[in-house]
From Swiss-Prot:
Keywords: Cell inner membrane, Cell membrane, Membrane, Transmembrane, Transmembrane helix, Transport. PANTHER family: ABC TRANSPORTER PERMEASE PROTEIN HI_0355-RELATED, ALKANE SULFONATE ABC TRANSPORTER-RELATED, MEMBRANE SUBUNIT. The keyword Zinc does not apply. The chain crosses the membrane at residues 9-29, 61-81, 92-112, 115-135, 170-190, 217-237. It is a multi-pass membrane protein. It comes from Haemophilus influenzae (strain ATCC 51907 / DSM 11121 / KW20 / Rd). InterPro entries: MetI-like, MetI-like_sf. This is Probable ABC transporter permease protein HI_0355. It is found in: Cell inner membrane. One of its GO terms (biological process) is transmembrane transport. Pfam families: BPD_transp_1. GO terms for cellular component: plasma membrane. Residues 50-234 form the ABC transmembrane type-1 domain.
Amino acid sequence: MKIRLLKPLLIVGVLLMIWQMVATLGSFPHYIFPSPQAVRQQLFTHAELLWQHTQVTLLEICLGLLLGFLFGLISALLLSFSRQISAVLLPILVISQAIPVFAIAPLLVLWFGYGMASKIVMSVLIIYFPVTAACYDGLRNTPQAWLDLAKTFNISPLRLLLKVRLPAALPAFASGLRIAVSVAPIGAVVGEWVGSSEGLGYLMIHANARMQVDLMFAALLILVSISLCLYFSIDWLLHRFIWSV
């Protein structure tokens, strides 16, 4: 356990050393590439401001993650339950991916406003298709021996889905959840970049416009920390409390 904790701390320490060396030896102006000390000072000086924007972004990420995974899981269940539904819904899902989600970010702000709703929708759209694909793939690849055994009991398609396909697809669901956790922050922050008045993405744009690059780095550092904490927390929960995948 101690070794597992030591490795990430060692990696962080090495990255901080490289950052400090580049900032010191690279002769970059402080307003182009701030040192770790300057960023740390901003973290303490603007702690209240950073916490205020962090709460907004964290809520957007969590709601987008929850809704995106839920919609993706429901869609995968519908696709696997009925061939008729799959024949109609699957082409629509594939065609929808031809439209870059980032390209419609301004439209989402126009439709849903500058508040939290447009950022949550952005996160949901980014999460939805990868989660649907991962969960659907898991539901389709049920071991044939399980299916053959289920047929001997003449169970209904619904019971086959719930009792056989669903348990067999649990590792795929875990993979889908990990994907969702990885990409959820992207949607929230891109939405804040396009149009917002709060959140870490907004704070980064605001600080960049005023050449407060050290504050922008502080916001970025918090965002990276949130992403890593969410991912490793979900990964630990999946291994510790649910199943080992």
